[in-house]
Amino acid sequence: ADTIVAVELDSYPNTDIGDPNYPHIGIDIKSIRSKSTARWNMQTGKVGTVHISYNSVAKRLSAVVSYSGSSSTTVSYDVDLNNVLPEWVRVGLSATTGLYKETNTILSWSFTSKLKTNSIADENSLHFSFHKFSQNPKDLILQGDAFTDSDGNLQLTKVSSSGDPQGNSVGRALFYAPVHIWEKSAVVASFDATFTFLIKSPDREPADGITFFIANTDTSIPSGSGGRLLGLFPDAN
C-alpha cells in the first residue's frame, strides 16, 4: 500500500470513520482517520486559500485555511516525517465526490522544499508554482478524473460541460518530479505548500473534499478509495 501523509479539507462528515460531525480540516498520517482536526467553516462559491508547512526541527505539520474577509482555521500535529515517509516522495492534490457532489477546482498551487546539511554548499531545494494550469500539462501527472480546463484551472473531479459537479468521481494531480523530502545528514528539512481552491455545489451537503498529500513516488489511486476515502486510502482502517 502507499505511504500517505495528507492534509484534508473534508466537506462531508463521515462519523463512522471517526470524522467529527461537521466539515473540518484534518491531518492524516497513513490513515483516513485523522490524527488532528479543526472545525472548518466551509464557504461554497468562495475562493479559499490553504497554507501547509513542516519543519523538521519543530517536527510539526500545520495547515491554515482561510477565505478573504473571514477568520482562518488552523490544524497542526507533531510528527517526525523521517519516520513516516520514504526519502523520495511525490506531492499531489486529490479530491472525490460521492452521492453528494461539489466542484473541486484548484486555481493555483505552489510548493517549496529545502534540505540543509552541515556543508554550507549542499542545499537541496525544489520549487514550483502554478498560477494557471495549461491544457496538456507536461509537469503534472493527472490520475483518475482530474483534468485542466480551458480557463486554466485544475479540476480534480468531473464537471459537466456547463460546469456542474458530477457524483462518484475521484481524481488526483501530482507534480512530475520526485521531491527529496528528508535525508539522514540534513540539519533541517522543511517544506511549504499553498493552493487556492473553489468548491461549489448544488447539494445542501457538498461532498467529499480536497487533500494535499505526500506519498511514495509510484503512488496511484487505490482501488475503492472514492467518496469518504478521498482518493488516498484503500480502506477506513
From Swiss-Prot:
Location relative to the cell: Vacuole, Aleurone grain
Binding site for a carbohydrate: 12, 99-100, 228
Gene Ontology cellular-component annotations: aleurone grain; vacuole
An example Gene Ontology molecular-function term: manganese ion binding
pH dependence statement: Optimum pH is 6-8 for hemagglutinating activity. Activity is reduced to 50% at pH 8.5.
Positions bound to Ca(2+): 10, 12, 14, 19, 208
Keyword tags: Calcium, Lectin, Manganese, Mannose-binding, Metal-binding, Vacuole
Function of the protein: D-mannose/D-glucose-binding lectin. Has hemagglutinating activity towards rabbit erythrocytes.
Family the entry assigns: Belongs to the leguminous lectin family.
The protein's name: Lectin alpha chain
